[in-house]
């Protein structure tokens, strides 16, 4: 499963997590998460997961809700500079989710993310 934006939120709630009804309630900078032109670079382990150089990438982020409590068996891969969870993966299932829209990012992580996810899943399936 590759979940995007609301898909991350649905996955999190399905696994028992909770959401901030509005990111401003959690003390997050709402402006960082409503940028339609390319948003705040996430920080964290997303670069390691994709095997790309660097640890910060510009992403297109436009949401007013976000993960408050992480669902069971989810692991945080990336957070924005204000601490909002931006990417997660399931610890044992082939589930990966991002809060931003990689399809709206023309280069860098936007192009690499779907390709790397598919490559890792094909590798996982063929080694079993």
Q: In which residue ranges do the predicted regions lie?
A:
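Generic low-polarity alpha-helical segments
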Residues: 2-4, 42, 50, 94, ...
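Hydrophobic/aromatic beta-strand patches that form the interior of the parallel beta-sheet core
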Residues: 2, 60, 77, 96-98
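Catalytic nucleophile loop
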Residues: 1-18, 101
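Acyltransferase
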Residues: 98-128
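Pocket-forming structural segment of enzyme catalytic cores
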Residues: 15-87, 91, 103, 108
């Amino acid at each position: 499963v590759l979940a995007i934006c609301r898909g991350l939120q649905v996955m999190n709630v399905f696994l028992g997590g909770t959401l901030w009804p509005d990111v401003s309630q959690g003390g997050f900078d709402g402006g960082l998460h409503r940028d339609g032109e390319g948003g705040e670079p996430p920080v964290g382990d997303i670069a390691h997961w994709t095997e790309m150089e660097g640890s910060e990438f510009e992403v297109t982020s436009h949401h007013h809700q976000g993960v408050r409590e992480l669902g069971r068996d989810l692991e945080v891969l990336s957070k924005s500079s204000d601490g909002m969870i931006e990417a997660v993966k399931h610890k044992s299932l082939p589930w990966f989710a991002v809060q931003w829209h990689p399809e709206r990012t023309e280069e860098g992580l936007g192009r690499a993310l779907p390709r790397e996810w598919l490559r890792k899943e094909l590798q996982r399936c063929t080694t079993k």
